[in-house]
Amino acid sequence: MSEIKEVRNKIKCITNTQKITKAMEMVSISKMKKAEVKMNSGRPYLKTIKEIINNFISNNTRYQHVYLEQRAVKKIGIIIISTDRGLCGNLNVTLFKKILDFIQNYNNRNITSDLSILGLKGLSFFKSLSNKIVYFNDYAKNNYTFSDCLNCNSIFMKLYSIGEIDRLFLAYNKFKSTLIQIPSIIQLLPLSKKKIHCHNNHWDYIYESDSKLLLNKLLNNYLEFQIYQASLENYTSEQAARMIAMKQATDNSKDLIRELQIIYNKARQDNITQELTEIVSGAAAISLN
């Protein structure tokens, strides 16, 4: 009897957990769809502003800017975009592993790294390393918006401008589809001239103000929005990964409940058989008397 009660309690607990994972799956689906719309709406802007910068520099090849300077690398900066919450599979783990390999590659060349971290999971993982964390933002406590990119971006821009860091990278999970999120590390600074000069057709613009001031503004805006767009990509990836993880948990709980139900039915059947045997034995004993 105690075994039946124990199995029944297990089934009840797993059923309650199943309801939670199913609810989290549905919430993640809703959040992912909203995030995907927001993410996709930002891609055309990022592409257009990059094309404008490309065309400007292609037609002003003598123009020099600190963000275009190629210099010897002594220290790098990495902006890491992670999540605040778990229950999203191995999304953070695969990204962190890629970042660790990336940092180690530079450490082998005696090049140090400074980190800027967005998300609690990134902070809890990388704070144990010897790398200096120059900036941190908590999504949960601060509703992350484009204005937050100004803080994250401005710190490394100053460090890069004064020569404290020589390269700046951005690490995040790129959203490709619901089932595929790609851990990515891209170079923000210096801007690659090879990529800039890849266009076959170029045209120049008529500038109402100083063209150099305009380019400086465009470059800063491009870098800020690149970080913001990456945060949208990572957030969409998080919701997709959590949706899949919760779906797998729900499916696994169904299988576990099914197995426990078989054990419960067998135990109950054995118990009924034992009771019937006792009744029959008792009746036989009475009839003999």
Curated annotation (Swiss-Prot):
CDD domains, per the entry: F1-ATPase_gamma
Cellular-component GO terms for this entry: plasma membrane; proton-transporting ATP synthase complex
**What InterPro entries does the record point to?**
ATP_synth_F1_ATPase_gsu (IPR035968), ATP_synth_F1_gsu (IPR000131), ATP_synth_F1_gsu_CS (IPR023632)
Could you tell me where this protein is found in the cell? Answer: Cell membrane
The residue stretches assigned to a coiled coil in this entry are: none
**Which residue ranges traverse the bilayer?**
none
Disulfide bridge partners, by residue number = none
A GO biological-process term? proton motive force-driven plasma membrane ATP synthesis
Q: Name one GO molecular function term.
A: ATP binding
Question: Which Pfam families does this UniProt record tie to the protein?
Answer: ATP-synt
Q: Which Gene3D superfamilies match?
A: 3.40.1380.10, ATP synthase, gamma subunit, helix hairpin domain (1.10.287.80)
Q: What is its main location?
A: membrane
Question: Its membrane topology, per UniProt?
Answer: Peripheral membrane protein
Highest taxon in the source lineage? Bacteria
* UniProt KW keywords: ATP synthesis, Cell membrane, CF(1), Hydrogen ion transport, Ion transport, Membrane, Transport
Subunit comment: F-type ATPases have 2 components, CF(1) - the catalytic core - and CF(0) - the membrane proton channel. CF(1) has five subunits: alpha(3), beta(3), gamma(1), delta(1), epsilon(1). CF(0) has three main subunits: a, b and c.
What family is this protein classified in? Belongs to the ATPase gamma chain family.
Function of the molecule: Produces ATP from ADP in the presence of a proton gradient across the membrane. The gamma chain is believed to be important in regulating ATPase activity and the flow of protons through the CF(0) complex.
Tell me the protein's name. ATP synthase gamma chain
Q: Which organism is it from?
A: Buchnera aphidicola subsp. Melaphis rhois
